[in-house]
Every structure is written in structure tokens, then in C-alpha cells.
Amino acid sequence: MTSVLPTSPGSRQSYWAATRSPRYSLTFAVPLLLLYETLAVALNQGTGVGIRNGADVLLRSLAATLLGDRGPVLFGGLVALLLIVVAVRDLRRSSGGLRPRLFVLMLVESALLAVVFGFVVGVVTAQLVNALPLLTIGQAQPMEWPVVLMVSLGAGVYEELLFRVLLVSGLLLAARAILGLGTVAASIFAVTIGALIFSAFHYIGPYGDPLDLPSFVFRTIAGLAFSGLYVTRGFGITAWTHALYDVFLLAARG
């Protein structure tokens, strides 16, 4: 459905409606992807070990299966190209151009949401398991701060792409087609199962955390929150919020 946005740049309706559109949401995600890919290449040069975000590794493995040996190398570029193509297509259909000021506001919104999410998810987790999640989450194999930053940025792009765009959407289709659930029931099923898988994913691999109940509940609730944010605010805001959320959380853990 097409809507006519108010012409005033400061309009609240204009901001919420415009920034959820692909031309803003996907364009906003591109710098995050480029920052992650640049850091990943720089940090992995000459190390002999390729450290990347786990969701990125999983998606690149899938790309290798589909595209052969060049799949992992081409994958990041293909994701960036897809984001840009969809954003440009939406921009051409819109009546006006992009307003740079809105991207600044989107970054501020993402940072505020990251702080709020950390607090709210922590409080809810503490109520459910009677524990302080930031104190009980186990320490995985330690990483230097540049690596922490790189992995966190990758979480924003690739974990949202994998767990929200692909997994939750796939579960929603399966719940309707296979289980015969209605829209509301299928949505609850997809978001809940997706959040559980999202949480479990963080305990896999050499850099995964030791499994314990408080951290598992903490990440499950975070997965539910990010799914809700994705539905209401789109991919770009959710990706940046997730990335900054991870940076703040890992910084708090030292």
C-alpha cells in the first residue's frame, strides 16, 4: 500500500514511515556491512586463521555449497549488492530523494534501543531466573577488542539476516503450510522457535559461551525482542541495534 509522507523533515510520521522503507532501512545497513567486512579482512590478514561472526561463517558455507569455491569470497559483495539494488529500486519509486539527517536520527535511535534492550532484557531475565545475567554469563575464549568489535558488527548484519529474515520467515511459512496454523499462531510459533535457535547458536564453536540457564534465557528474550523490532522497524534499525547491543554487552563483560 502506498502512503504519502508529510513534506516536513521534522515530522514524526515522516521519520517513522520513511526510515522503515527499503530505501532508508537497507541503505542504513550497508555501512555496517562494509565496516564488518573491512575489519574482518584487516584482522585476518597474515594470521592463518579466519575469525568471523558465526552466522557469517554458516552463510558462507552455504554459499560455498551453492556457488563453489568462490562462494565465500563473493558472498559479502553479493549481500551488499542485493541491499543496494533493493534500496535503489525503492528510491526510484518514491517521490523524493534521501534526507541525510534521517540516517543520523536512525543511528541515535539504534544506540538508544541498544541501551534500552540491554536493560529490559536483563531485568526480564533476572525476574525469570532470579539471577543477574551480565554476571552469570560465562566467559568464552577471550578475544581482543578489535575482534570483539568485528564480531559484534557482523552479528548485526548476518545474525539478523540469518535468524530474522531467513529463519523466522521460513518458520512462518512452514507453520502455515505444514502445521496449518493461522496468522497469529504461526507468528508466535516462528518467533519463539527462532529465538530459541538464535540463543542456542551462541554456544557453538571455540568462541561460544559455556551453556547455562541465565545466559540462555537472556539470549532467548533478546531474540524475541529483535524479532519484534524487525517487524516494526525493519532490517536497518534492527541490524544496527543488534550490533551496538552486542558491543555494549561485551564491553560490560570486559
What are the residue ranges of the model-derived segments?
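N-terminal juxtamembrane cytosolic/stromal segments of multi-pass membrane proteins
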Residues: 1-25, 50-54
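Alpha-helical transmembrane segments and their helix-start/interface "positive-inside/aromatic belt" motifs
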Residues: 13-31, 98-112
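Alpha-helical transmembrane segments of multi-pass membrane proteins
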Residues: 29-51, 121-122, 126
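Hydrophobic core of alpha-helical transmembrane segments in multi-pass integral membrane proteins
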Residues: 32-37, 75-89, 115-119, 196-197
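Perimembrane loop-to-helix junctions flanking transmembrane segments
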Residues: 49-66, 136-140
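Juxtamembrane helix-loop-helix connectors linking adjacent transmembrane helices
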Residues: 91-156, 172-181
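Transmembrane helix-loop-helix hairpins at the membrane interface
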Residues: 145-254
